Amino acid sequence: MTTLPHAGHLLERARWAARAYADYDAVTVSAIVTAVADAGYAEAERLATAAVTETGMGIAADKVVKNRARSRGILDYYRGADFVSPRVDTARKIIEIPRPAGVVLAVTPATNPVCTVYSTVILALMTRNAVVVAPDPLAQNCSADAARTLADAAVKAGAPDGIVQVIDESSNSLVEALMADERTDVVAATGVAGAGPGNVPVFVDASADIAAAARRIVDSKAFDNSVSCTNESVLVAEESITGALCSAMTRHGAHILDVDAARRLRAFMFADGHLNADVVGRDATWIAARAGLRVTPDTRVLVAPFEHVMAEEMLAHVKMSPVLGMTTVSDDARGIRAARAVVLIGGAAHSAAVHSENPSLITDFAAQMPVPRVSVNVGNSTGSAASEVSLQPQGLISWTRIAYDSDVGVAMPNFAGITPWRTPGGPVPRYPHASNDQRTAPLPQRNGHPIGITEAPAGIEGHDH
């Protein structure tokens, strides 16, 4: 088990690496990021299989897609973006110099244990930050494997030793201590309390292409057994098209439950009023069998009807599994209100989806959803894929502004191409000590005691877990 003092040494090593990396120029940083993305892409299949084997959650083939999207996919998305070189605004006579945050603590989830490591590490390196990965204990091995794969690639490409590290054995108290430690500059927490679960509604109105909507919704809900926060949670359908929609979804692998079957499923999934963690990321057939339901072996999604969207209706809550709640409404206005209610139950500030050919309806729907992203006529786990990466490069840098006199008569020199950063020469910087168990310098003191997590914060015991 990683101890508090040892974790403190990881942070010290990360700070050392961050200081060295902060002086790298844009060309060198780009080469390092490319090498890391390529390494992640090359191991996408192996690590996807490892993730499903270790956690029992999700579908390996779908995790391969995610791993590739979070490696070279992120690289392609930000291709041409420069978060290293100074920005020169000659019209406003302002030069902005980017400064990295420093050390990023990446708290990664068991539901997406590899792709989250990929995206956080790549975005951190893109902005010249160091990363310490704290895996969910349920996915310790595959997350650590992913982190070490990227760390090796980064150092081989010229990054400082220790730029990416991983906690060997994590625990809640250890992570809380790391989050509170002053040597941690940014906490990238995914899949933990405070990170914001998604409770995504999808509304299908009478104008929608029913066949296309059915296929997209089932495919999206079934994707990776719905462990992503962007997967649809509750289907809101207009009564006039509900029959056709259900028939079409059945052709794509959905099983529509009757009222009694939905009751039994609800009782199994929410026996004590909370989601049964055993269902997270499991196959629809696995869930059905344990709920006492008979379905065909090719069932991909269970659709569970209920009457009203309200907090007391557990099927209107986040389910993290291929179980889709469904309610019907008589018209567009009621559909929008029902979808909004779903969001407010557990997914405010996340995403929503609508299938419609009515521009007015789409606009009204988007305006009334308390979310930053609305997907239209697409599976939400695809249409809002970027929303799964809550961390953005802009959140990992700050800008120092150099401002000249705004008087047009006062000239500003030509700053084009000038940068304070360097192309490193010679061997890759190595950490002064090979072992993390050796401190390179004494910790700063406060009232005679070391500052940091070598002494546990209040309420957290400083012993092995």
What function would you assign to each model-found segment?
Residues 1-95, 123, 251, 442-459, ...:
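N-terminal Rossmann-like NAD(P)+-binding subdomain of aldehyde/semialdehyde dehydrogenases
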Residues 5-6, 92-94, 120-121, 222-223, ...:
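Short beta-strand/turn micro-motifs at beta-sheet edges
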Residues 10-12, 194-196, 224-229, 313-320, ...:
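Short, flexible turn/loop "capping" segments at secondary-structure junctions
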Residues 15-18, 22-25, 33-44, 48-51, ...:
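Structural signal for hydrophobic packing residues in well-ordered secondary-structure cores
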Residues 22, 293-452, 456-465:
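Conserved C-terminal structural/oligomerization subdomain of aldehyde/semialdehyde dehydrogenase
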Residues 86-212:
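Rossmann-like NAD(P) dinucleotide-binding subdomain of oxidoreductase/dehydrogenase enzymes
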Residues 175-176, 214, 336, 363:
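Short hydrophobic/charged patches on amphipathic alpha-helices used for structural packing
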Residues 192-310:
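ALDH superfamily catalytic-core signature
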